[in-house]
């Protein structure tokens, strides 16, 4: 076992900051040198990581990341945002003894992870904790799912199947006014949500 590790936390969602903080505050901290990169200026990351680099946009960054990892003797590369672009180069990173962490293994698994409903079913099939969900494609299916879930749970939420995990997430409630949607982007009157969804058809 090595006595020291160089790890690289590449562009991620808001978790990038959290991951670096957790590593810095962990028992592993004395044994780690943390490199990180982002395609935008992120001063808070510069303050946290041992080294910060401006990286190309994710879809253009696999070659750049590989070169940087080789140059700085990186043992582990974590990619948390649009990591399917990096996943395609897993074997190349492995050839240079760089462990690649992208949240999934293989392009097909990345597609599964991006589909939140399918990902929930996969977790359930593996007996991993997951939140019960229904996938709907029409307003009548939405109404039926809402009725069913309101009978089973005191609080229900809705979110798009694809996209950033927190984006579009909304808690539905019969007891809030339509105006609440202008005050909170995460709380919506149930009927208002149904009416808005119906306009998509």
Predicted regions and their residues:
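Conserved short-loop catalytic and cofactor-binding motifs
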Residues: 7, 11, 107-108, 130-133
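Active-site nucleotide/adenylate-binding loops and adjacent lid/helix of ATP-dependent enzymes
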Residues: 110-201
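ATP-binding N-terminal substructure of ATP-dependent carboxylate-amine bond-forming enzymes
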Residues: 1-104
